[in-house]
Amino acid sequence: MDGVLPICIGNATKVVQFLVASGKEYQGSITLGFATTTEDLDGEEIARQAVTEPFTSDQVDAALAQMTGAITQIPPMFSAVKVNGRRLYDYARSGETVERPERHITISSFKQRQASTYDSATQTQTIYFTVACSKGTYVRTLAVDVGKVLGVPAVMSDLTRLKSGGFTLDETVTFEEIAAHVDTTLSDPQSRSFRDTGPKCGWRFTDLYWECD
């Protein structure tokens, strides 16, 4: 996964609770036809069922619509959620399974962003989507649940976070850009903030960072 990740430093940590509470927006893809332990492409394959006939756009739209609104979700075993003081991924790596608490989430929008593609060689189908959701949502699990609605195993095959904490992808900077700016700042004491990092700069609360330069 890539995309927007707000990072708070110094006095800016005072706004973390507000950033965390905000919703998020993503774009990504769901591949139908197989499932993995992690619900994405990083895990081991645990199920496969050929998609012999590609689902129509209307069928996909109907499946996404079923996952829209106020819904409940079971977090994946490979996640940081704690159960009895242990992270779920600790249980998963030990080969253990535990009962996972339901989470109440809200999916504000879940739509196709372009036509799906069908691979006749692997008999898989890939859906391309955008989703707006509340905090605590596992998009991997949304992908799996879409597959369940359609009657086939599924994984999240790609994901980019477009918006988080009020910041959009266009406002972000890369770690490489930050490192380059820090080098410039150290060599030029008059440069005391990220104000001149250009239109991609995501540091909206610039004044809060001055003491950390």
Where are these regions (language model features)?
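Catalytic/RNA-binding core of pseudouridine synthases
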Residues: 1-213
